């Protein structure tokens, strides 16, 4: 059984021996968020597409704007989940549990950092380079587990490496984020040998011990030793939910901006999420809005709320 008292830790990866609580204007988890925002890998997301190619004069979402929006939704979900847990377990009020919103927000900001250009197509291109292309020349020089990592390249595992690996000339611990933020981005807490047909896994062989250290410190449930596999950190589900809410809504909004969908088709898609009474109220409000983009932005924001309400009813 996992325990909230251990699952949320402000200990920083790579700075464990210097761990201390600072009583300043930001919590440790807000520091994680700020550290990511000001980083070069985060800025690089602006040139990575979300779904549609970057068309220039029409501003559709890219990975950077998507990550910012996911972090906002994640913060709201995390804050509400923390309130729900505290209502049932008030003894956790003086723990780090009220910080869940900040942790999820930071993890959401980092969730796409390891994705190559062109998303899943980019992952397949890298994998194919090693499994069928010139990269095959390296096969005999690598252990089987590392070769498996390369022939099933995974953006999520690459994000964990980017955040924790000590690159040439850089400090120990990578971004030196808190253990809880790092654990919250690992959707697939197992190695590539367990990836299966979907080729999904959470860390490369080179970072396996780093993940083990984090998981053991947080008291995450270990499901298997060799190959290594853990149960997810609970906050991963909130990061994943925020990501799903955003990309499904934003893809529809972008399709409208690019004139792939008409205004009527887009409104029908978005309004289908609502009961008839709420839908009638929204249509009445839309009668007062003449700007076409605003006619879509309004139901998009309400659809976020609808998804949020639905999730919170399950807590």
Which residue stretches match the model-derived regions?
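Sequence-structural signature of the catalytic-core scaffold of metal-dependent phosphohydrolases
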Residues: 1-25, 37-48, 57, 68, ...
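Conserved small/polar residues in nucleotide/adenosyl-binding loops
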Residues: 303-310
């Amino acid at each position: 059984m996992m325990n909230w008292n251990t699952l949320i830790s402000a200990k920083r990866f790579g700075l464990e021996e210097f761990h201390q609580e600072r009583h300043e204007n930001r919590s440790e988890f807000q520091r994680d968020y700020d550290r990511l925002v000001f980083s070069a890998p985060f800025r690089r997301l602006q040139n990575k597409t979300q779904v549609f190619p970057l068309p220039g004069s029409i501003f559709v979402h890219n990975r950077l704007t998507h990550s910012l929006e996911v972090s906002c939704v994640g913060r709201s979900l995390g804050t509400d989940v923390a309130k729900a847990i505290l209502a049932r377990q008030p003894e956790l009020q003086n723990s780090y549990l009220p910080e869940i919103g900040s942790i999820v927000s930071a993890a959401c900001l980092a969730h796409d950092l390891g994705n190559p250009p062109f998303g899943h197509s980019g992952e397949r291109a890298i994998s194919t380079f090693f499994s069928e292309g010139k990269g095959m020349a390296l096969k005999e020089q690598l252990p089987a587990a590392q070769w498996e990592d390369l022939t099933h390249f995974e953006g999520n595992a690459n994000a964990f490496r980017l955040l924790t690996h000590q690159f040439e000339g850089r400090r120990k611990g990578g971004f030196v984020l808190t253990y809880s933020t790092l654990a919250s981005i690992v959707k697939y807490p197992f190695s590539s040998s367990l990836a299966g047909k979907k080729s999904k896994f959470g860390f490369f062989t080179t970072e396996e011990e780093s993940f083990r250290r984090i998981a053991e410190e947080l008291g995450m449930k270990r499901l298997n030793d060799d190959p290594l596999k853990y149960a997810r950190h609970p906050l991963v589900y909130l990061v994943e939910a925020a990501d799903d809410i955003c990309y499904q809504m934003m893809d529809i909004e972008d399709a409208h901006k690019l004139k792939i969908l008409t205004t009527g088709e887009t409104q029908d898609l978005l309004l289908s999420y609502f009961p008839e009474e709420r839908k009638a109220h929204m249509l009445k409000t839309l009668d007062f809005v003449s700007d076409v983009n605003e006619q879509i932005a309004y139901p998009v924001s309400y659809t976020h709320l609808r998804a949020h309400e639905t999730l919170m009813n399950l807590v």
